[in-house]
């Protein structure tokens, strides 16, 4: 009987922990116009930011038919996040880059930092609060 009570307590606590391990982030992506697909990546660490889709804790794609694009995305609980979005105008499934570095399609980072070279996670990191909308402004 004692084992069953312990098991029930552990399962109950696991349920509480699971619900506390996720949060919703509200995102608005401005400047996309009406062509292509908008890709959104959310990173919770510098690992893979901003290029490696597989390192993102959330990825989503939206066929562009409205500006702005608005979404509520569920991500694992973390202290901070860095978001990257781009508009895949030619719909080839990737961000086209000149010499493998310079974006050739509209893109945006959270906090909209001015960057020369590869952006740093710390420059784009945000700590969203309940109800806050993170605005990403696409630029060429």
Predicted regions and their residues:
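Sec/Tat signal peptide C-region and signal peptidase I cleavage site
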Residues: 16-22
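Extracellular beta-sheet/turn segments enriched in Thr/Pro/Gly and aliphatic residues
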Residues: 105-140
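Exposed aromatic-hydrophobic patches
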Residues: 68-76
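Acidic, glycine-anchored loop motifs typical of Ca2+
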Residues: 90-97
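A short, amphipathic beta-strand motif
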Residues: 25-32, 40
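A short, solvent-exposed beta-strand micro-motif common in secreted/extracellular proteins
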Residues: 79-89
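Cleavable N-terminal signal peptides
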Residues: 9-10, 20
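Bacterial N-terminal signal peptides that target proteins for export
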Residues: 1-8
């Amino acid at each position: 009987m004692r084992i069953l009570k312990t098991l029930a307590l552990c399962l109950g606590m696991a349920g509480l922990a699971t619900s506390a391990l996720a949060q919703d982030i509200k995102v608005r992506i401005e400047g996309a116009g009406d062509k292509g697909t908008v890709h959104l990546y959310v990173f919770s660490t510098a690992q893979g930011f901003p290029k490696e889709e597989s390192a993102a804790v959330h990825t989503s794609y939206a066929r562009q038919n409205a500006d702005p694009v608005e979404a509520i995305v569920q991500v694992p609980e973390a202290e901070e996040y860095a978001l990257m979005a781009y508009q895949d105008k030619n719909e080839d499934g990737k961000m086209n880059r000149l010499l493998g570095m310079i974006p050739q399609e509209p893109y945006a980072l959270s906090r909209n930092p001015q960057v020369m070279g590869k952006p740093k996670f710390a420059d784009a990191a945000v700590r969203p609060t309940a109800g806050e909308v993170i605005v990403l402004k696409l630029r060429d």
